[in-house]
A protein has these predicted regions:
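SF2 helicase motor core recognition
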Residues: 42, 220-236, 251-259
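Conserved helicase motor
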Residues: 2-16, 170-173, 191-208, 223-229
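Interdomain hinge/linker at the junction between the two RecA-like core domains of SF2 helicases
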Residues: 99-160
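SF2 helicase catalytic motif II
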Residues: 37-40, 50-85
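Conserved interdomain hinge at the start of the Helicase C-terminal
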Residues: 77, 83-84, 138-173, 177
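C-terminal helicase lobe and adjacent C-terminal extensions/tails of nucleic-acid helicase motors
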Residues: 86, 153, 160-162, 173, ...
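Inter-Walker segment of RecA-like/P-loop motor cores
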Residues: 1-44
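Conserved two-lobed SF2 helicase motor
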Residues: 26-46, 213-229, 241
Length: 454
């Protein structure tokens, strides 16, 4: 059973949808495919509907894909919860990642009272022990670690020296700007933009187009945000990655010569845009940690286990708080009062549930007129035609998140149905090339705050 927001149930009859809804509440199924958001927010919830599934996690095996993406500011409560599942509920945990964080290493620092890293008490066992000679077979790319320092236009010229490429940047604003620069210089139909300026259905269709071009040997030039770095099976001869953390660089490299069919290694370039401001938050910490070890990586070539551990030690030493919302303290308390909390069952589940948000979303979701489905759905909303369950499911796939300032900028182009559904009425502000587009109103649509695409 699949339990996540991208499920397309439009072809399912109502009775099947109702049955599946019950299954998603209790996870009474032998195999569940879900997301970190669903999993962890259920574990930390105090609401009956979300907690109803927890007993089925006992005596199970939980597989986490891309475990390096656990948010640092929530690591303490998340790791403590996972250890509790393992110790008390006999749940086996399998962490899948090319860059395993040091979740089992003690990073205590006496000068950081109350902000220390919680590590697993038992060491993580490697399913496949590291063997340099064995793993050499997976060295499919050559890393160019010394960052290229280029303006947007210089980067565009650099990219167009390749028939096919994937360029990954840190923000939607950068993606749109580089795409515009490429469009000025290149008029081919194989140039594709990907970002969360586009609704999920739009992204899905673009990915299908990219995969078909790659499969048939046609050229394809892609400028994208980080959305292609995990769970997207693409294979390019050359990849450019804006400066980020080592984990992100290696994720991007996984989209280069992925299937190992090239007679020579693929090429991975790292670059910094000269117009780019110093990043804040998680992205800034990650960039700083990578820059500190560029010389070491140049010597290594392909990152080794020691390089990955060095990176995470550096990165985690810069993180200010691994329990930024105080969730772990609400549930487990300090060492001094932990036993008393357990004896008296004094746990503040309600506040912990309110504070634990796997993804902080400060955007407004706007339904956009993408394709026939988007236009028809907006027409239904405008004509006050009652929406069916399938329509509500489709709302998610046709929505884009925008920030308050951009919501205000779009002004009268966004209307509400009165029940909380916002929709874009002016089609000129949704482009088939880049999605939401308000460049004509002289407004930058999005900003970078913590390294996650926004």
């Amino acid at each position: 059973m699949e339990h996540h927001s991208d499920i397309d149930v439009r072809e399912q009859p109502d009775e099947v949808q109702e049955y599946n809804k019950l299954l998603t509440e209790n996870w009474d199924f032998p195999l569940i495919i879900t997301t970190n958001v669903q999993f962890f927010e259920s574990l930390f919830s105090n609401r009956v509907a979300r907690c109803r599934k927890l007993h089925n996690i006992c005596n199970s095996v939980v597989v986490f894909d891309e475990a390096q993406m656990f948010p640092p500011e929530l690591l303490n409560p998340m790791l403590q919860m996972l250890q509790s599942l393992n110790y008390s509920f006999r749940t086996e945990l399998l962490l899948c990642t090319a860059t395993l964080p040091i979740f089992d290493k003690d990073l205590s620092n006496k000068n950081r009272d109350g902000q220390n890293f919680f590590c697993f008490e038992e060491p993580i066992e490697e399913v496949v022990p590291y063997d340099a000679e064995l793993f050499a077979a997976f060295d499919k790319v050559t890393y160019h670690w010394s960052p290229l320092k280029l303006s947007t236009d210089e980067l565009a010229e650099h990219l167009l020296q390749n028939d096919s490429f994937l360029c990954i940047v840190n923000s939607r604003k950068d993606a749109a700007r580089i795409y515009a620069s490429l469009k000025e210089r290149y008029k081919g139909d194989d140039l594709i933009h990907l970002s969360r300026r586009m609704c999920a259905l739009h992204i899905q269709n673009r990915l299908k187009e990219i995969k078909e071009r790659l499969r048939s040997g046609q050229s394809v030039k892609v400028i994208s945000t980080q959305l292609v770095e995990a769970g997207v099976d693409l294979d390019f001869p050359v990849v450019y990655r804006a400066m980020a953390g080592l984990d992100s660089i290696m994720q991007a490299a996984g989209r280069c010569n992925r299937e190992g069919r090239m007679p020579v290694p693929g090429k991975v370039y790292i670059f910094r845009l000269t117009e780019e401001r110093n990043a804040n938050g998680e992205l800034g910490l990650a960039q700083g940690s990578l820059e500190d070890m560029v010389d070491q990586l140049v010597r290594s070539g392909t990152p080794q286990q020691a390089d990955i551990e060095h990176y995470y030690r550096s990165f985690y030493s810069k993180v200010r708080n691994f329990d930024a919302k105080g969730v772990a303290k609400l549930l487990w308390g300090d060492e001094d009062d932990q036993k008393e909390r357990i004896r008296s069952l004094r746990f503040d589940y309600e506040k912990a549930s309110d504070q634990f948000k796997y993804i902080e979303d400060h955007t407004k979701q706007i339904v956009v007129p993408y394709g026939k489905e988007g236009k028809e759905l907006i027409e239904k909303i405008q004509r006050n035609i009652p929406l069916r369950r399938n329509d509500y499911r489709l709302l998610h796939r046709l929505s884009v998140g925008i920030y308050e300032k951009d919501y205000l900028t779009l002004g009268k182009s966004i209307l509400s149905d009165g029940d909380g559904i916002l929709y874009l009425t002016d089609e000129q502000y949704y482009s088939n090339d880049i999605g939401i587009d308000i460049a004509n109103m002289n407004s930058e649509l999005l900003i970078v705050s913590d390294g996650r695409e926004q």
